[in-house]
Amino acid sequence: MFKEGSRDDAALAKEGLFDKLEIGIASDVTIRDKWSCGEIKKPETINYRTFKPEKGGLFCEKIFGPTKDWECYCGKYKKIKHKGIVCDRCGVEVTLSKVRRERMAHIELAVPIVHIWFFKTTPSRIGNVLGMTASDLERVIYYEEYVVIDPGNTDLVKKQLLNDAKYREVVEKWGKDAFVAKMGGEAVYDLLKSEDLESLLGELKDRLRKTKSQQARMKLAKRLKIVEGFVSSSNRPEWMVLKNIPVVPPDLRPLVPLDGGRFATSDLNDLYRRVINRNNRLKAILRLKTPEVIVRNEKRMLQEAVDALFDNGRHGHPVMGAGNRPLKSLSEMLKGKNGRFRQNLLGKRVDYSGRSVIIVGPELKFNQCGLPKEMALELFEPFIIKRLKDQGSVYTIRSAKKMIQRGAPEVWDVLEEIIKGHPVLLNRAPTLHRLGIQAFEPVLIEGKAIRVHPLVCAAFNADFDGDQMAVHVPLSIEAQLEAKVLMMAPDNIFLPSSGKPVATPSKDMTLGIYYLMADPTYFPEEHGGKTKVFKDEVEVLRALNAGGFILKDEICGSRRDETGRGIHIHEAIKVRIDGQIIETTPGRVFFNTIVPKELGFQNYSMPSKRISELILQCYKKVGLEATVRFLDDLKELGFVQSTKAAISMGLKDVRIPEIKKEILKDAYDKVAVVKKQYEDGIITDGERHSKTISIWTEVSDLLSNALYAEIKKQTNSKHNPLFLMIDSGARGNKSQLKQLGALRGLMAKPNGAIIESPITSNFREGLTVLEYSISSHGARKGLADTALKTADSGYLTRRLVDVAQDVIITEKDCGTLNHIEVSTIRQGSEELLPLKDRIYGRTVSENVYQPGDKSNVLAYAGDVLTSSQAEAIDDAGIDSVKIRSTLTCESRRGVCAKCYGLNLANGRLIGLGEAVGIIAAQSIGEPGTQLTMRTFHLGGIAATSSTPEIVAECDGILVYLDLRFVVDQEGNNLVLNKMGALHLVRDEGRSLSEYKKLLSTKSIESLATFPVELGAKILVDDGAAVTAGQRIAEVELHNIPIICDKPGFVHYEDLVEGVSTEKVTNKNTGLVELIVKQHRGELHPQIAIYADANMQELVGTYAIPSGAIISVEEGQRIAPGMLLARLPRGAIKTKDITGGLPRVAELVEARKPEDAADIAKIDGVVDFKGIQKNKRILVVRDEVTGMEEEHLISLTKHLIVQRGDSVIKGQQLTDGLVVPHEILEICGVRELQKYLVNEVQEVYRLQGVDINDKHIEIIVRQMLQKVRITDPGDTTLLFGEDVDKKEFYEENRRTEEDGGKPAQAVPVLLGITKASLGTESFISAASFQDTTRVLTDAACSSKTDYLLGFKENVIMGHMIPGGTGFDTHKRIKQHLEKEQEDLVFDFDSEFESVAG
C-alpha cells in the first residue's frame, strides 16, 4: 500500500538519500509488475525431508532468491564467481541470500477482493466514495445481495440492493441483459471504476453550500474530504479492490525446523496458505462451470481468507491457529507494543551493553562508576584487540581473542589504559526522565556488581535492594564526545522539571551533616562552662584534633584543656572569622572547611532542605566545577560524621505523650455528644460520620504535635535519634512518628472511605487483633493501587511524549508581542507559590518598574529574569508580571528560546535544538509514577484535608469583598453566596469603602485572602481590626446550608409528599425527616417566605435541590439567618494522587468531567423561570443591554447562586468541575490556558511535587494547535474540518492575496491522544495508536511526510532534527546545498560557453 515506485527508489531509501516519504494505494499493475518477482501458485512451503523450498511455493528460490549465498537450488552454480547468472536448470539467480528479505511475490486472485482496511475502518472509505452505508456494502461484499451497477432501461436505480428473490423477479420482468447487477468485490470494483470523482466533488460542494443543517453539513464535509483526497492524489478508487495480493519476502515470515521434525512458522504463512488454497480451488470451480451457489460460497470464503490475512478478527470470528490462538495478521504485525513500529523501529536492542546488580560506591568521585573487570573486558574487547595489534603483542584478531580469554597480564594493562577517559552510559529502568541515563568514567573493580555514587541515586530513583542497571559503551568518537560533554553525571545535578538540585545528600549523609551542625550546647558554670574564645578556625580545628571529639557528652581522647575537659563538638565557642567574632560550634567550623569561601560562614543547623538551598546557591556563585567538588566533600563528610556519631534508635527513644489518655477521653466524649445529636435528629447520619472524623483528625494532629514537641525538648534532644532523623529530613516524618508514639489514627477502607473508629494504639504499645486487622485492610489498598497505577502513569507519560515530541527550540526569538500574566498563588493567607518562583527564568514582555517610581526599571522588556531580578520584583510588592510563554510563541515550527526562557537543568538560556517537548512530557509524567508508587508508604492512613475554621495569621483590617450575608439571631454574619472572599489588609488608616475600592481594582495587595463557602459563619465585622491568631470565621464542612435572609412565614411550594418529597424515618434515631427526592414531574420544589401569615405578600423564594433535608415546617415563623434546609455533603474521602492521576489525565485528555458544573455565558443578574422537562430554567440577564442567556439545569444539581446574584462570564452556577471546552467557548483561549495550567499544577502541588509552569504550558499549547472551520470562504478548507493554526493562516493569506474571501474558524481543544493522531506526520501518528486507521487515511489522500519531527526520523533511520548540534548541522546542510547549486550553475555556464 505504498506509492508506486521503481527499484531505484528502494536503492535510494537504503542509502537514506531522501527527505520525504509519500504513501499511496498500490495499483494491480504496480503490485504485479514493479513489486513482484513472480507469482505464487502453490500453497507448499518447504520439503519436510530435504528442508529445501518447494518450487512455485511460498518459499520458492526461483522467485525469492537462493537460501545460501552464491548457490543455486540444484547446486550447479556455487561460489561468487558465478554472480548474477540465472541457472538454466532451476531458474535461480546466483546472488546473496539476503535478497530473500527484500524480494516480494504476488498471488493472482480469481476474482477481485475488497481490501478490508478501506471498507471496515471507520469512516468506510469505499462507503464514502460510493455514498453507500457500511451495512449495505457488507451485504454486497459477502455475497448476500446484488447491487445494480447499470440499471439500463429498467426502473431500477444505480447502487440499489437486490436480494435473490428480487433479482430473479427483475430478471423475469426485464430479461438478464437489460441491466447489470453483481455481487462481491467485482461489483464494488465496477462501481468504483464508474464513479466520476470530479463531478461528485462538485455536487458535494454544491450540497454543502445549500444545506443549513449542522449535522448534514458535518456528514457532507467528511465525505467531501475523502473524495477530495482521491481527486487531489494520483490514487484511483478502484485500487481499493485487489486483483493481486502482494506476498511478503520469505525471510520476514520464516519457517524454522525444530528438533523432532516439527517446524516453527510465522502465522503469515498459514494465512497465505489459506488464501492460495481457496484461490486455487475457486479457479478450478470456475473452470468446471459449477452451480452459482457453490461458486458464490467459495468467493465469499476467499474474501474472508484475504480479510484474515490483512486484519484477522476485523470481520467475523478470527482465524485460529494451534492452541486456539488467533493468528497474527499483517495488521497485528504493525500494531501495538510488539508491532513493527514500536518493537523494531522505535525501540531496538543495543550491542556493546551489559547489565548487573548495583551496589553503593561511597569511595567514588561524582563522575565515576565502578565497572566489574570481567564486564569491562567483554565490553571493551574491540578496543583491546586494536591496542594489542598496534602494540605488536598479537597479529591476528583470533590470537588477540585467545589472549583475552586467557586473561594475560598485558590485557589488563591495556584495559586500564583504554578506559581512561572513555565514558560509559549507565541506565536504570524505568527511564522516566532524561536523568535515567547518565555517563560516568569507569573505574575497574573486583566482583560482579556495578558500583554507583550515592548522590546519583535520586536521579535514577535507585536503591540497593537488588536494583539492576545497564551499561552501554559509546563506540564512535562523536558518541564519546557527546557522552563526555552533555551526559556526564556532574552536568546533571539539577532537575529539568523544576531546577531544584537532584544530587543532594540524603539518609546517612544528611544525618551526619545535621549532627555536625547541631545548635550550640551551653555548659553550666559549675562544669567549667565558660565560652572558649579562639583566634581563628585553625586554632579550633587544632583544639578539636588535640582534645578529641566529644560525642554524647563523653570524652573520646586523652588530652584535656585547663578546665580538665576536651572540646565538645557541639559546645558553644567564640571564634574570629574574617575580622568578626562569631558564636558558633567546633562542628560548624569543621563543616565550613569544605564550604567554598564565596558562600560565607554557614552558622546554622543543616536539615536536608537547607543543604539543597546551599547547593543551589553554590552553583549560582561559584559554578559547576566547585559545586561538584563541594557535593563530593559533603558526601564524604556526611558518611564519616554519621559513622562517628553512631546514631541508632532504641525503643525508649519513642516517647508516648503523657496527655494522650486525657486527649482520648475528651475525644470520646465529643464523639458521644455528636452521636446524641444524631439520635435526637438534630443532624443526619452523614453529618455524624463527618463530624466524628473531624474530631479524630483534630486529635491525631494534637497528639502528633505533642509528641514531636516532647522529643524536641528532651534534655538530650540533640541526641534523640528519632528527632534527629526526622528533623534532619534523613528518614521518616511526623506522620510516622505519630504512629510510633502517639496513635495510628484513622484508617481508610480500600474504596477510600474512612473508617470512623480510629486505631488509638501506637506501635510502641502494640495493636489489638481488631486494630491490626483494620490496619492491614487499609495498607493492602496501597499495594494494590501501586501495581495498577504504575501502568496508568506510564501510559500517560507515553501520550504526553507523543503529543509534545515535535516541540523543539527552532529559533532565538520569534519577536511576538503577546504575553501571559502571572501572579503569586495563594490559598487563604498561605502563599503556595511566590511570584519570584513563577517568573524566574522567564522573559518579561514589558518593562517592570519599581511601584511609584518609573525611573527605576527592575527589568527591561526582553530580559530573561535571573533569580536576583525575580527576587527584586517580588520584594518590590509587584502583584503580577507580564511574561512571554510558549503558549503565545509565534514560531512557524517548534518554539523560540525567548518564549521558553531558561533551561532549568543548567540555569542558562535554552539552546537551539533542545527537545523541550519531551522534557516537558517527562517532567509531568515522571512524578506521576513516583506518586503512584508512594501511596502505600503511609499504610492506608486517612489523610483528610479540610479545616473547620479560618484563623488570622497576622494583624490587619478584615474587609468583606463580593460577600452577601445575613446577621443571625446570635449576631454572627452568615454568608449567602459562594463567590465572595475575606481580605486581610494592612492597617493604613483608610476608610472601609476606600479599602473595598482599592481591592476591587487590585490597587492594593491583601496580606491574606480567604475564599469563604456558602453558610460560613463570620465572627468579625466588616472593617474590624483583627490580631494574629484570632478566629475570623467558622466553615460548615458537613452540609451545604440553605439560609433564609428575610423574616416571614414559611410556605411549601411543589413540596408534594410522595411525589417531590418523602418522609423517611431514621432507623437509628426514630425521627421522621422530610427529604426532597428526585422526581419526573413538572414540580419545582421551593420554600416561599411571605411577610404575613395569610400568605399575601411574597418576600422571597428558595429552590430546594433533591437530597436536601427540610429543617422548617409549613407556616412556621422564621427570622433572618435561620436554616431552611440542608444538603449533606458526601462523606469525606481521602485525598490521594489516586484521585490526582486520573484528574491529570482527564485534564490533558480534555474529557468532560462527570457531573460537570454549569457556567454563566454572559455577565449579568441571576433569575429563575420555572421548570421545563425536569430541568430548572435559570436566566442570566444583562441589565445594560437587556440580553438574556438561558441555562437548563438538572434538578439534582446544587445551585451556588441565588435570584438577584450578580455573576460574571465563566462563573460557576452549580457545584462540580468545569468543562474545559465551555471555558474556551465562553471565556476564550487565554482563560482556558490559565485554567488548565492551574488545575494540573494543583494536583501536583497537593502532593508536594514541584513542576515549572513552562512544561505544562507546552502540553497545553499542543492541545490548542488546531482550529475548526466554521466558514470555508473561498479557501480550499472544508466546513467542520480541524486544521493546524499555521495552515489556516497560510491558506487565508494565499486566498486574500488572490482577492478571495478568507475562511472563518474557532479555536478547538483536543485531548492529547487526539492531538497526537492529528499530527502532520502520518508515520508519527501510525506509530502511536490506531495504526491501521492512520495508514488507511494517509494512503487514500496520498499524504507526504516531510520527516520534520523526531519519531519519523528515528523510524527512517535518519539523524533527528534536534540536539545541541542541530543548528550547526542545519547550517552545514544549507551551505552544502548552496555549493551544489553553484556548482551546477558554473557547469551550465561553462557548457554554454564551450557549446557557443
UniProtKB/Swiss-Prot annotation:
Keyword vocabulary terms for this entry: DNA-directed RNA polymerase, Magnesium, Metal-binding, Nucleotidyltransferase, Transcription, Transferase, Zinc
Biological processes per GO annotation: DNA-templated transcription
Uppermost EC category: transferase
GO cellular component: DNA-directed RNA polymerase complex
Residues reported to bind Zn(2+) 2: 814, 889, 896, 899
InterPro entries tied to this protein: DNA-dir_RpoC_beta_prime (IPR045867), DNA-dir_RpoC_beta_prime_bact (IPR012754), RNA_pol_asu (IPR000722), RNA_pol_N (IPR006592), RNA_pol_Rpb1_1 (IPR007080), RNA_pol_Rpb1_3 (IPR007066), RNA_pol_Rpb1_3_sf (IPR042102), RNA_pol_Rpb1_4 (IPR007083)
An MF annotation (GO) of this entry: DNA-directed RNA polymerase activity
Keyword Transcription attributed: yes
Sequence positions that bind Zn(2+) 1: 72, 74, 87, 90
Pfam families: RNA_pol_Rpb1_1, RNA_pol_Rpb1_2, RNA_pol_Rpb1_3, RNA_pol_Rpb1_4, RNA_pol_Rpb1_5
Cofactor notes: Binds 1 Mg(2+) ion per subunit.
EC number(s) recorded for this UniProt protein: 2.7.7.6
Highest taxon of the lineage: Bacteria
Reactions performed catalytically: RNA(n) + a ribonucleoside 5'-triphosphate = RNA(n+1) + diphosphate
Binding sites annotated in the UniProt record for Mg(2+): 463, 465, 467
HAMAP family named in the record: RNApol_bact_RpoC
Subunit structure, interactors included: The RNAP catalytic core consists of 2 alpha, 1 beta, 1 beta' and 1 omega subunit. When a sigma factor is associated with the core the holoenzyme is formed, which can initiate transcription.
Summary of the function given for this chain in its UniProt record: DNA-dependent RNA polymerase catalyzes the transcription of DNA into RNA using the four ribonucleoside triphosphates as substrates.
Family recorded in the similarity comment: Belongs to the RNA polymerase beta' chain family.
Descriptive protein name: DNA-directed RNA polymerase subunit beta'
